Amino acid sequence: MNWLTATADGVRLTLHVQPGARRTEVAGLHGDALKIRLAAPPVDGKANACLLAFLARGLGVSRSAVTLKSGDCSRHKVVDIRGITPEAAAGLLPVKE
């Protein structure tokens, strides 16, 4: 899984996001990234906030454990999540490969 790598204190996700979708959901793979559709529009950071909250909820970690590392104004994003193992993260994110 190229989209999921282990870090010292958790995992790093490589994501491709699609803001303005009908609903927020994991949509499968997009190249080497996990594709996530977001219901929030890409305006005033709403899509980023929606993404981080969605990941925190889905992985069962606090919102403060999820950090956007790069891609603030891009569809390609890198997110670090503390307090979860790669195995647990892969099991909690429904990916159709």
From Swiss-Prot:
**Disulfide-bonded cysteines:** none
A Pfam family for this UniProt protein?
A: DUF167
The membrane-spanning stretches of this chain are: none
InterPro entries, per this entry?
DUF167, YggU-like_sf
Any one cellular-component term (Gene Ontology): cytoplasm
Q: Which PANTHER family match?
A: UPF0235 PROTEIN C15ORF40
- Family in the record: Belongs to the UPF0235 family.
The record ties this protein, via NCBIfam families, to: DUF167 family protein
What is the name listed in the Swiss-Prot or TrEMBL entry for this protein? UPF0235 protein LHK_03181
